[in-house]
Amino acid sequence: MKRKSSHYNDAHASHINEDIEESYKDLYNNLSPSSTILLLLYARWFPATLIHFLDKYYTSTPILIDMIHKQCIYNPPKGSLHVQLEYYLAFLNRMALIFDRFPDLFPTEISKVKFFTKDFSKKDKLTALDTYRSFPGSTWKTIVTFATQEVFYLPEGLEPLKRDFSSMDKLKLIGKITYKLRLKGDTALKFAYLHAPSDVRDKVFDDAFWQEIITPKASLEQQSNNIPTGIQDSSKYTVNGPTERDNKSMKSFVRSFFTSTDSSVADTTIIPSMTQQFDKDPSTLVQSSIDKEIQVKEDGTTSSVAVNAETAVQNVNGTIKESQGTESISFASKNNSAPSADANNGNMTKLVSKEKAFLNTVTTPNADLIISEEDELTEMTLRTANGSEPTKKSNRSEQSKTVANTNVGSKNGTTPRSFAQKSSKRIKPTEGSANLNTVTELTGIGSRIAMNGSSVKASNISTEKSKTIAKPKPAKELSPQATLNSPIQSAEAGNVELKLHPQTPDRIVKVERKVHSLNMTLRSPKAGSAGKENSWRSKYLSEGKNSKAKYTAKQPSYDRAGSSLASPTKSSASPLVKAPKETPERLCTENQSTENEDQANLKESELPKEKSDIQPKNSRSTIEYIETSTRVYEMPKDTIPSRFKTSISTEVHDGRLKKYPYYHVKTPEKGTTVVSRTVTSPKSGAYASPSKASYNQDSSPNASLEQCFVQRSPSKMLTTLRNNSSTFPSLRKNAMIARKSTADSLSSPKRQSVPSTPKASLSPRVHKSMTYSPSEASPLYANKSPKSSTMVPLMKYKSGLNEGMRTSSIYSSTSSPYIRDQYFLNRMLTNGSHNGSPSWRDGLL
């Protein structure tokens, strides 16, 4: 792909200008799977740029959209969080080489995107585990939580980052990375060590480093209150923090871990407070809250953000019982040597060049994880198993033979600790082991590492009963809940500044940016079995241990021009406006579209399965409708496509207002019924006055969106819904009555007398004030008072869609991931600190 480097010179402005836009057109005309991956990585750092690009050109770039979803955003492999993290790290390694091949595809300077970072300077408690689930990597701050430790990725500042990827040694310009490690066990340190440059790795053998990173901070009262009740011998807890002997033990353990190549490291002495075992069920432990102050601000200065670990502990305890019997997942490389300080990127090159590497493998439920040793590179292959969990209860001898499984809190009291000697083996599930605490051996760049990890949900990967190769020595293992309360766990870990290694792209920080607010047209899954085919949708479309909801893994195929060959719909030519979908944690306003013609062309197998035994989370097709006030958010003219109007919608969420951006398609396809809400802006400015809001209701399938406006007061509606959780069902009932009573008049010729407004009077971005009284507009609100605060505009549906409230055809050509994007962005813009409470959800759902 040839590019003109003249587009990317030092004369660039700090914002997206027309030169870059022309370059994007060049990229668009030469799209290929490799270049789309590169564009995807670019979007992880500059999401607004890619959103702008896709808004203009996405109609004929389905390969890009498909690649974004398949490669990294919505299909992390099953398993614990660090398994997914390794997946993304491998992806970033692959992307780094593409940077080297196409250096001038990226501008040398781009300003920071305040839109994605402005709300995070506020002090608010963030639960690390919840943060990871809600918006992984979307915020310049990625918090990865395991059962026993938290690792914080914090770019040093949010100042504009200069990009010049003309060669691999320029990757260091990405910026400095600050690791804040909370030493709950040794795993956080191992993790940082694996991804640290050589000069930082040497610190492991520096006594001054240990003096700094292990410092007693907890008070006597705090420690005495935090001693768990289930610990066998609480006297081993030191009162005044870790002793010198503890520090030496930790140093000895870590150093031997990073230098040993056999399983003898399991016998290494560990800090006494880290070797406690449970004599009761782990869920009986006292849950303590350990708050960690992390420093991050927009301008790079420091401000306090309290991260509460209590919820993470509760999540662990809440799922230990139900995850009994799940197994460890082992990633082992043939190269069993410890990470070397001078590791090169040789294996990473193999990872990029090898077709059947991490990125082409997606874990599906009920599949065997087979690790081959044909190459130094760990290669994952998936084979469908019988789909049932092993019923035979593992005895102690079987459990002791299990490879790479810590089984913290297992019933026999002792758990094996070892590292696989051979990389081709099938891991055996063990009864009585909590999946949250499995050790996973990760294949780094020519190295191997084991971690204590946790998964939010119990993994559903069942494996055949087969003998494991290694027979590790049983040894006491870390206890996540116990170490959570030990004195050393509450110590301030200190800051370890890690600089990116010039020649090792694996040192890039995981910046997993979700691409938000994209207008995507993707087909919904067809009938099929997720257990028989590897589906990139399976992570989100299958739920629970024995999900019976059936989905196909068949993916849409595209011709070179980019039009969809597999989809029977016409959506690739005329994309629908995607609606933020109603999820269990939010109720949103949405732009809705139904295509009657496309609905008629759908095959029966492609219609959503309404009667599935288990309705997958985030894939419901029911749309609840709420009116909200809307405000125009003006952006520079060169960043907004002319056929889109960017808005920020304010919605009711647990008594608070939250914002999310969405796009309105200005001109709908003929035959498409659109219900859209636009904004009347009496004045210009960054935020126009929300005093008046106008709502569009089209009168015929080919009517313009601006044909009908109804003026009303939105604030009363918000207040009513916020204070009365039972309002909405009655609103829907009234709406149904109004729909039936006005069905004839909606389609009658008299409808043509509705006052219409010429399109010429409308700005492509901001509507001028245009108001009509409800009585003039339509008989739609005939049974409603014009000033009623509970008035709900009716939506026109294709007949037969479940009394008009089912909008199946909207999502017949849509996949749920985009809908979740709106949700993630919504959570991100509101700090992600509050989930929807059942109090207001019950009345609305």
Swiss-Prot record:
Primary location group: mitochondrion
Full protein name: Uncharacterized protein C428.10
An annotated GO cellular component: mitochondrion
Origin: domain of life: Eukaryota
Compositional bias (Low complexity): 563-576
Record bears the keyword Phosphoprotein: yes
Compartments where found: Mitochondrion
Compositional bias ranges of the Polar residues kind: 224-241, 400-422, 674-683, 691-701, 743-760
Basic and acidic residues composition bias: residue spans: 390-399, 534-546, 579-588, 600-614
Keywords in alphabetical order: Mitochondrion, Phosphoprotein
Positions bearing Phosphoserine: 567
Region (Disordered): 224-244, 324-346, 383-434, 456-485, 519-619, 674-701, 739-785
